[in-house]
């Protein structure tokens, strides 16, 4: 979403994680996605770092100008603590050391905080969309999809926020399906208007 927001054109290479091309490892030894390789050869292989780089290029609506420290704290908390519990909640069958209910309870603690904020605010930092909304949205969306009924019933403000983002022109513009890139050719050039 940050690339579309900042109108950053790029070469897109859609891959299957179960069949990662060798070229991915040549660009980043981590072999994870997303990865952004800049024209000067610089490689950015963390989602939030890619988002921040995009915003530094073109921050049309000031996504990262307000509550900078608080946004960074939310994002760090998401990427360390929330994601840990979210993975176990989503894949509870793999993580048998605790019950589904335990994982749901851990995820719930984060969702309660976000829901409380959104009962008072249109977005997580106030009246306008910011980087933290875009950074957390995919993870909250994943949490919601584990048990949509439970999520909607227990977190109405968060559900409304998520739905608002899911139907936004910005989100819809990035949801295009791409063919899987074969290791032998170029990717697809994506340009934002």
Residue ranges and their predicted role:
Residues 1-108, 115:
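GST-like domain detector, emphasizing the conserved glutathione-binding G-site
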Residues 12, 127, 152, 174-175:
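A generic structural-conservation signal
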Residues 70, 74-167:
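GST-like fold's C-terminal all-alpha helical module
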Residues 178-193:
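Acidic/histidine-enriched, glycine/proline-rich intrinsically disordered or flexible terminal extensions
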């Amino acid at each position: 979403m940050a690339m579309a927001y900042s109108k950053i054109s790029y070469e897109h290479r859609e891959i299957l994680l179960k069949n990662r091309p060798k070229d991915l490892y040549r660009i980043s030894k981590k072999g994870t996605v997303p990865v952004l390789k800049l024209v000067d050869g610089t490689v950015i292989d963390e989602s939030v770092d890619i988002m921040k780089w995009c915003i530094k290029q073109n921050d049309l609506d000031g996504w990262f100008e307000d509550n900078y420290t608080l946004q960074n704290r939310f994002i760090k908390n998401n990427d360390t603590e929330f994601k840990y519990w979210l993975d176990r909640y989503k894949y509870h069958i793999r993580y048998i050391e605790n019950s589904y209910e335990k994982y749901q309870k851990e995820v719930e603690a984060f969702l309660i905080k976000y829901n409380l904020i959104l009962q008072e605010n249109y977005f997580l930092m106030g009246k306008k969309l910011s980087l933290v909304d875009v950074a957390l949205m995919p993870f909250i969306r994943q949490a919601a999809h584990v048990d949509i009924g439970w999520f909607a019933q227990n977190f109405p403000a968060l559900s409304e926020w998520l739905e608002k983002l899911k139907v936004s022109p910005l989100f819809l513009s990035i949801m295009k399906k791409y063919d899987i890139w074969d290791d032998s050719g170029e990717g697809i050039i994506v340009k934002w208007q």
